[in-house]
């Protein structure tokens, strides 16, 4: 499987260089590594033709635009799958890409997990790390640096879910679709883009910069919800884990309110569209039944008439 790796970069050059070195030295090597920069320009230091800097400006900046910038190059490359990583993350195991290749051969969309590095010396540690360690902090016990989604049981809940409603509930909590570490098969990405284009008119990528250009995050949660409604095969696993260079968080206590509101608005819109589409399908079935019923009645009548005529003769 030929794989693309896309690394977002906002003035995180030193960390990105370390990640590139790890990827190029892994047993399963990427066909392309795109560095998506919307801050200071990034210049390739390896001389390796697989490393492609995309120094973005204009509409290809910000959380959505920067990631969207790699969609067209990936699709043009002919590679089979694409893995996205944040610039402050690095592969946490030597078989990182090998495991992704196996997973993306069987799933459309894969969310991996992340492990935080020690937070010694930080004034405002990552909020998800604090949430995962509320009990530990209260009892003055050592911190657990594992992913909040593992600690909370969200990964296990997704694995045990059986219905669309169960998975939708998990997606809406924001505890599945994180953009720090995820991957698409080519087919899964193309299907998601078709769904988003027909639903929102989105045609430049998979992250909706119109709905999520302000406030804190949640464009990744929205992408996951879209993928669920598009019918993609989605999994989340600790089998593809990144390490996260812990740093002081940049979000405040109420920064997530606007993002949560946008998510619920998106969900309500998708539900309405889904209900409308269900009505159209049911109407088509009824119309088909009437048409088919009328046709059958006509054929039966014709057959009876012919038999009657043959009997007379």
Regions from the PLM with identified roles:
Residues 110-130, 135-137:
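Short beta-strand-to-loop element that shapes/binds the nucleotide-sugar donor at the catalytic cleft/hinge
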